């Protein structure tokens, strides 16, 4: 069997950003594509963790990565917030993640993050793309990227939604430039859906939610669905076959391999109730 990619960012309906699918939907989609792991990264919350744990505990065969999308800033009042991702390497990292969220998901410095037990990532569709639009050189981009372990790269159609860059060739050149800066700073560039729904057709449901939430350009949202490995490779074929495989499959698996197996369930025997399983999860992840 060919090696499969790992999606390092999915948003579930337990978050507040308009996702329409639950954790079970995503986990099933990943398993159908034989993906070895999946990261749950809701924005500013971790309410999906117990349900995700229960799904993996029931199904088995896939590594669950516990993560979250938070924000960092520079100015004392944090007028501009910049999104980034945190993934827990182990149970200690999960506990540290809980502490960060409890303190506040918007006002801590990256220097306060325990890098021993946590993995930090940033998306191209955040501070990076804004700096590029403002004319930043590679040295300035490198100063941003070097603080993270990986950078998430999206399909080209995402650029029109996040940055209003409609020129496909320009978007491709920006992606190539980010990959080059990542490699010069020993940071992993990784392809990601940053998914908000499982199937392409679910986009209409999210559009309705965004419209209800008052998002003005909701009709322009890209296809933020959970792509299979072959679909993601096709999105990045403009990089060449070898480079596309590297950022889609190789690098995503490298991050997944950084996550140890301390989250493997110890309640594999039959006969446990849902309440017992969730109680076990809370106890082992907070003690």
Question: Where does each model-flagged region fall?
Answer:
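Phosphodiester-processing cores and adjacent nucleic acid-binding clamps
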Residues: 1-287
């Amino acid at each position: 069997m060919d090696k499969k990619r790992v999606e390092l960012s999915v948003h579930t309906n337990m978050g507040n950003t308009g996702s329409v699918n639950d954790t079970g939907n995503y986990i099933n989609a990943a398993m159908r594509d034989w993906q070895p792991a999946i990261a749950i990264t809701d924005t500013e919350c971790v309410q999906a963790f117990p349900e995700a744990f229960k799904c993996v505990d029931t199904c088995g065969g896939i590594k669950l990565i516990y993560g979250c999308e938070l924000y960092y800033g520079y100015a004392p009042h944090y007028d501009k917030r910049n999104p980034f991702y945190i993934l827990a390497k182990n149970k200690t990292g999960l506990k540290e993640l809980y502490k960060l969220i409890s303190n506040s998901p918007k006002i801590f410095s990256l220097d306060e993050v325990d890098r021993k037990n946590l993995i930090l990532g940033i998306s191209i569709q955040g501070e990076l793309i804004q700096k590029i639009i403002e004319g930043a050189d590679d040295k300035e981009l490198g100063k941003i990227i070097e603080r993270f372990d990986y950078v998430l790269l999206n399909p080209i159609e995402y650029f029109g939604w996040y940055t209003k860059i409609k020129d496909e060739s320009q978007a491709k050149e920006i992606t190539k430039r980010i990959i080059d800066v990542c490699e010069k700073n020993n940071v992993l560039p990784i392809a990601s859906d940053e998914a908000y729904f499982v199937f392409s057709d679910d986009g209409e449901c999210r559009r309705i939610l965004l419209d209800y939430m008052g998002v003005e350009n909701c009709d322009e949202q890209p296809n933020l669905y959970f792509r299979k490995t072959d679909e993601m490779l096709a999105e990045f074929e403009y990089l060449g076959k070898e480079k596309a495989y590297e950022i889609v499959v190789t690098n995503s698996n490298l991050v997944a391999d950084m996550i140890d197996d301390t989250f493997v369930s110890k309640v594999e025997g039959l006969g446990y109730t849902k309440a017992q399983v969730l109680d076990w999860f809370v106890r082992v992840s907070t003690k």
